[in-house]
Amino acid sequence: MQVILLDKIGNLGSLGDTVNVKSGYARNFLIPQGKAVMATKANVAMFESRRAELEAKVAEQLAAAQTRADQVNALEAVVIASKAGDEGKLFGSIGTRDIADAITAAGVKVSKSEVRLPEGALRNVGAYEVSVQLHSEVFATAKVQVVAE
C-alpha cells in the first residue's frame, strides 16, 4: 500500500516520502496515529499545499524534544528505592514505568514508551545509565540509582 509520510519514521522515511508498506501496518498504525495518509491524488495535492505547515510542525516537535533531552541530561541521579535481599538483588524489578515515573517526579515529563532498557528490567541495586528516546532523532541519558529500602 502506498502512503505519504507526515512525520519521520525510523527505518522507513521522512516527511513527504511516498513509501510502500504492508496494508496492515498502514491501516492499524500509521494512518490512525496521523503519521501517514494514503497516496491518492487528492491526498498528494493536499500534502503539497500543506508541506510548509507540516515541516514547521516537525521542526517544532524536534526542538521541543531537544529541549526535553537537555533537561533529562541535566538531571542529577534519579533515586528509586525498592525492596532488596542481602546480596543486592531486588525482590521484583525496576521497569520502564518505574523509571518514567521517577524522572517525571524529578521534573521532566517522560512516558514509559520513551524509556529504553535494551538489557531488560533492572534487577540489582546500583547505578545505571538509562537511554530515553524522546523523538526518532533525539536521545537522552538519565542516571538512575537503585537503592534498597
Swiss-Prot record:
Record's keyword terms, sorted: Ribonucleoprotein, Ribosomal protein, RNA-binding, rRNA-binding
One of the record's GO molecular function terms: structural constituent of ribosome
SUPFAM superfamilies recorded: L9 N-domain-like, Ribosomal protein L9 C-domain
Pfam families recorded: Ribosomal_L9_C, Ribosomal_L9_N
Name used for this protein in its record: Large ribosomal subunit protein bL9
Domain of life of the source: Bacteria
Example GO biological process: translation
PROSITE patterns the record matches: RIBOSOMAL_L9
One GO location term (cellular component): ribosome
Matches recorded under PANTHER family: 50S RIBOSOMAL PROTEIN L9
Keyword Repeat listed: no
HAMAP family, per the entry: Ribosomal_bL9 (MF_00503)
Family statement drawn from the similarity comment of this UniProt entry: Belongs to the bacterial ribosomal protein bL9 family.
Purpose of the protein: Binds to the 23S rRNA.
